[in-house]
Amino acid sequence: MSLLTEVETYVLSIVPSGPLKAEIAQRLEDVFAGKNTDLEALMEWLKTRPILSPLTKGILGFVFTLTVTSERGLQRRRFVQNALNGNGDPNNMDRAVKLYRKLKREITFHGAKEVALSYSTGALASCMGLIYNRMGTVTTEVAFGLVCATCEQIADSQHRSHRQIVTTTNPLIRHENRMVLASTTAKAMEQMAGSSEQAAERMEVASQARQMVQAMRTIGTHPSSSAGLKDDLLENLQAYQKRMGVQIQRFK
């Protein structure tokens, strides 16, 4: 799983199901693909979204700011700063400073995420606030590790009563990951389509898959409902690749 796919998975796992979730997923995809580089418009859109908690808005604002690199000099937004202040608790700020010093020594996404997971959500949010307010700097990869650790903490607290102790984290994150991977696979199918008769068939399958993912995000579904979605798509893609003589490994 690529870094941006992982970030998208974790961030979407804390967004409540509904039309807004599908909209946010599309915004994230566009930002990560470099198709949306207007940070000011993105932030204004995010600020006025209903339903989302201030912390979720803060995390999304932080991710948008990290990703739209050409706009890093833009003025910081108050709604993000307020969300990432650790509820104004000085203990959170103290822990955030300690975490920041540890993160400065990390160079990988997974290393940063591992370190961050031992801190509370308030301390993690405060640490994001330090970075957002330019009081500290880390690599984008390390910052994304911090984001995903925060989302995992939030998702865990939302689903603690249902949590299964398995290596692939909680059901909500697994569910979101299947949908993100299904979307990614559908995109790959569309890019490979060409102009043959089979290509039209594959385009149709990919289009249906994208619509299904959007519908699942909009209406909300049980975490187990997406289990077969990615596998069905991968099977279709691999069958198509065999027919076209394309290497399969690339999309596993």
Curated annotation (Swiss-Prot):
Transmembrane domains' residue ranges: none
Key words, A-Z: Host nucleus, Membrane, RNA-binding, Viral matrix protein, Virion
Membrane topology term: Peripheral membrane protein
InterPro entries (UniProt xref): Flu_matrix_M1, Flu_matrix_M1_C, Flu_matrix_M1_N, Flu_matrix_M1_N_sub1, Flu_matrix_M1_N_sub2, INFV_M1
UniProt similarity note: Belongs to the influenza viruses Matrix protein M1 family.
Alphabetical list of HAMAP family matching this protein: INFV_M1
Official protein name in the record: Matrix protein 1
Provenance organism: Influenza A virus (strain A/Duck/Czechoslovakia/1956 H4N6)
